[in-house]
Amino acid sequence: MMELLAPAGGYEALTAAVQNGADAVYMGFGAFNARRSAKNFTDEEFASAVRYCHLRGVRVFLTLNTLLTDRELPGAAAALRKASAMGVDAVLVQDWGLLTLAKEIVPDLPLHASTQMSLFTLGGANAAAALGMERVVLARELDRDEVREICAGCGAEIEVFGHGALCMCYSGQCEMSAVLGQRSGNRGACAQPCRLPYGVNGPCRDAHPLSLKDANLSAYLRDMSSMGVACLKLEGRLKRPEYVAVVTGIYRRLLDEKRLPTAEESRALEQAFSRSGFTDGYWLGRKGKPMFGTRPENVPEPKELFARARETYENGKENRKIPVNLRLTVRRGEPVRLGGACAVPGGVTIVMATGDMPEEARNRAVTEEELRQRLTKTGGTVFAADQIEIDLDEGLMVSASAVNALRRELLDELADRRMDTPKRRELPASPLPEAPAGAAELDFTVSISRPDQLTAELLAERPAIVYIPAELLDKMDLTPYIGQAEFCAVLPRIFRTADEPVFRDILQRHPEVASAAIGNLGHLAIVKGLGKTLRGDFGLNVYNSRAVLFWQEQGLSSVTASFELRWQQVRDLGKYADCEALVYGRLPLMITENCVTKNSVGCAHGAGSVLTDRRGEQFPVLCAYGCRCEIENGKTLVLADKPEVFRCGLRYGRLRFTTETAAECAALLRAHRAGTVTADDNSTRGLFYRGVE
């Protein structure tokens, strides 16, 4: 049966999830998880939570799914070791450096690819499986046919998001909260700017064009199960325990009874939490305005619903009784023996408790029924006597206290065995290699977004690399420019399995394009065997030195540093590979499956629109591959007038052209070459000096 995975943002939510039927829970401890504002767990609480869950047959997944700096990796390594020793069943990861570290130091600990890894194709899922991921959490934007295709072709388990909040941006690719407020969604500190009002091609009023309704896929569980989805995930580590109880309980019943939700259950889900109702738009492939909604302020608490929910888990309520088979032997001349058997992970365990010799009855002999009644008294434990066998010689006496003591001893031992932690290896981390000599003098590269931006005037300024969106190559003639720069095809950050052969064909048709920019793990399947030089784009979220080394092992000759990093952190990355950073241009804040422009003012046929926030700041909305949207920062990044750019070990500084004219592109590269770049009121330093939380 498909696993039901529930959120546990704190201990009360954990008990709510377990007592309402979760097969597994996901939770975090420490700072390294994607919901840092959840209560989370101390080390002691987490160890206790693991024992609580394992005793009841519930698996525990630790969320270490954030991006980490070099200085944070030792702390994350310590968390991995603790998790392995505590018996955690799997760890969710996003960071490429943490992935390699985990495989080194706790090689027996199962790893799951977080949705923050931005995996949405069969090639990406299989690449994750080849890296040792036992499970892949797919992007929430996939429709059911796409999920079915990945389930059928992937060697790893597939986890699908079933209920709860939807981000507007693809997980792992959102920089809006980071760039605007230094709170990184990639580090568990998202400020949720998508829930705020914005105007589209006009002033900000009361519209919320980035606020998606919560997903509710309760009507499609049989569909998911039949296509091979291994796990259904419920969102809500920031939600109340009562919410967790309500949602988990309903989904548990739907899975067990293989049915659709009743009208009452649907109302309960909406009462527990919703934003103007729910959406199943992505699952059905129906994008558009009906998917969007808001939650009014001061929504009254559903007191009656939540009161009933609390009754399911408060005051030591135990809904998950573990069946145990008991056999009591009372014979003359032999010690009283109580044997018991119950399920444990991987099989069945058998325990024997031995007491004193039975006595000859002086008045009345003990009966089989009396012994049976004493053995059924398992209250206060998670066990329930299922089958009881009694082998009793006539005329003997065994006290109630003796039978009770044997029962307690046996059940305690069974509990200990269910909570046993697996024996796992723990190995030292390999040291980072000796850093080679620093990079050569920084050179400038450019990326264009329209064919008209590539001109002879631009190439006259000698860019080291010209990045061109791969989907534009068939519309451009690069023949006149061969030899003037390295042309690099930029594969789209967001694409689908059906696009893999399309882009492979494009790359094969253009031998004049020497290299390809990789922005997603799934791109490796597209470029394999083509002989192109591979370069890492910013979509990879390269955050630390081990991530740099990981991508070197995948064949990349250069990487682009995450633009969330401060210049000192970028300097650390440049020690191990040719490193590139954005030094000019609009920073991409979001890439979205829903089209902001079409939903608000109608399709602009590639022209895009402008988003305006409450303070009057304007953000260009550009058309991205596949009729997706990319929201750009309103201010332009300018860094090349700062000396730190040239002192932080960068091999390349990229000028990212989006809204610029062809003449502006050439003039800007000329100014960078001449060292005459200046910042003004419409520019920003990005996060180069500020960094993020």
Predicted regions located by residue number:
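Active-site pocket-lining/capping segments in soluble small-molecule metabolic enzymes
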Residues: 1-119, 137-141, 146-231, 238-693
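Long, basic N-terminal domains or extensions that often function
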Residues: 134
